[in-house]
Amino acid sequence: MSKVILKIKRLPHAQDLPLPSYATPHSSGLDLRAAIEKPLKIKPFERVLIPTGLILEIPEGYEGQVRPRSGLAWKKGLTVLNAPGTIDADYRGEVKVILVNLGNEEVVIERGERIAQLVIAPVQRVEVVEVEEVSQTQRGEGGFGSTGTK
């Protein structure tokens, strides 16, 4: 397996923050940090856009997936609103994370706090072909819980 290189440009408001890193040897996601000037209060059911201070150069054929951190979701009720957020390989703007507080208490995010995970994943592009009919399956049109919960 060849090594995939992720090039990162750190913006001025993130110069003192660590670069994204894996927390353990087998972590799938790189931790993204809040590049905010001062603590940010997030009220219950409020959403905020948090800068990371990073611009990524994701290799062609890959995407960045911004995912919630399980600890923030469990302990504080915070999650990534559009999870997984997609960062396309040709995007060159600052990476920002949309967080929402689904809890009943106000949450404070501190500068440098780990707020999300970034997973770099391969992308498979497809050719779109319009047809008159699609093949039948045993499942058919069943969806939205049609297979039960047990």
UniProtKB/Swiss-Prot annotation:
One of its GO terms (biological process) is dUTP catabolic process. The keyword Magnesium applies. One of its GO terms (molecular function) is magnesium ion binding. It catalyses: dUTP + H2O = dUMP + diphosphate + H(+). PANTHER family: DEOXYURIDINE 5'-TRIPHOSPHATE NUCLEOTIDOHYDROLASE. Keywords: Hydrolase, Magnesium, Metal-binding, Nucleotide metabolism. The keyword Magnesium applies. The gene is dut. Substrate binds at residues 69-71, 82, 86-88, 96. It comes from Aquifex aeolicus (strain VF5). It is an enzyme of class 3 (hydrolase). This is Deoxyuridine 5'-triphosphate nucleotidohydrolase. Its cofactor is Mg(2+). Its EC number is 3.6.1.23. This enzyme is involved in nucleotide metabolism: it produces dUMP, the immediate precursor of thymidine nucleotides and it decreases the intracellular concentration of dUTP so that uracil cannot be incorporated into DNA. NCBIfam families: dut, PRK00601.1. Pathway: Pyrimidine metabolism; dUMP biosynthesis; dUMP from dCTP (dUTP route): step 2/2. Belongs to the dUTPase family.
